[in-house]
Amino acid sequence: MRRKLSAIECMIDGNIVYMVRLEGSFQEDRLRSALARVQRKHPALRMLIRKERDGLYYEEDCAPEVPLRIVPRMAEDDYQRESYVELRKVFAVDQSLLRAVWLHSEFESDLLLVTSHRICDGMSMLTIVREVLRALHSDEELVPYEPISAKIMIGDYQPQHPWKRKLMASLLNGALRLIPGSSSTSENNEYALEWNVSPSLTEALKLKCKTEGVSVHAALVVALDRSLLKIVGKKKLPGWIESPMDARRGRLAALKSDMLFFGGGSLKMRTGQALEEEFWARGRAVNEDIRRMVDQEMLDIPGRYYFNELLRPVSNGRIQTMVRLGDALHVNGSWNRLALSNLGNVIVNDSDAPFRLKDLRLYVHSFNFRLLGLVAYALNGEMRFYYVGDEKCLSRAQANALKQEFMALLQHQVDPLNGDAKAFPLVTAAVAQ
């Protein structure tokens, strides 16, 4: 069975890499078995992408086994080199949409898991990591499920006036066809910053958020908004901070928390609002806005899928023209947006595993649109941040200044007497991507 990629799936062209550092040992045959079992569970990992004259197609249940490349681990930072390679390596048409690299040494290993962003978001990738690590030492059954299709997401939804939706889609399709295609590919000059916050500051921030009745995510939104405004100024401020919403977690009956999925809702918060308001008062307002937006997104998802099915995929040449247009117009951020993703407290390893999870990192690369985003997550009691941006969206100097201002602002909310950039206990590492 096969189906054509939707317009959104065609546009989301990029790779995700997760690196897990494991202290302990396991055998190659056990790793291959773990990858195979996880692949058998998830329909998206058994698909291939075929290129036909009229577009891209998913072909189900025909992918070969997950490729595993084994590399001797000679130095602690070898994963950076391999992650860079894997981020930019296009998935071959005859290979699974998951591949693995094992940087092996006697007592410690780095495992890279790589997938296409078309089938997988950050939370889905954590599911893959969790299941692979579990399967390395457990024979617990992984139960397959049916592919998640647009039809399932739409359900019994019907718009009140279908002709209006069809007319709108027809006009949009016509407008997109007028965009000339570009034969050359824009080079994305992405770079990344990574930093960890000490357990003491992480815990203090969590307690402060709880006391103030504000989610950690709402606090991060306010801090990012105000820091970004200070660094780039009002004229260059992206109009929106956009956060992906996990449509699983019991919110949609068709989706279970352990299913691979990409394409849920997103929460868009306008930047530069209520700047005179005290930080935590603004945080409570944002917190309530997020609650309302989540409820509304859950109602809107079926209709959005219905409309997306009416859209025609945009060719890569036209996407490149759109990217160049954005460059020429000096659009703020990534098409006037900055993405903020919060993966929450990451727990992927079992206490009874014969190895210990020492580290987990993630990396993202886009093959078409320019990236600008910040990912937050907590691991082993430490809050961590991964910033990725294209130089045309934010310069390296601006990104470093944003990091310092962002962290100083968070520190100030926890301890106003020591709220400067040098006061917080921070472990930082910059990685060119």
Residue ranges and their predicted role:
Residues S105-E108, R134-V143, T211-H217, S227-P238:
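Secondary-structure boundary elements
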Residues M1-S6, I16-M19, F107, I119-L207, ...:
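Non-catalytic, low-complexity flexible loops and terminal extensions
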Residues M1-R53, A75-L98, K230-Q433:
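Acyl-thioester-dependent acyl-group transfer interface
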Residues A7-M11, Y58-E60, S183:
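Short, flexible, solvent-exposed loop/turn segments with mixed acidic/basic and small polar residues
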Residues E23-P43, L113-R130, W195-G233, F385, ...:
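Acyl activation and transfer enzymes in specialized metabolism, enriched
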Residues R32-R130, R134-H137:
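Acyl-thioester-dependent condensation/acyltransferase catalytic cores
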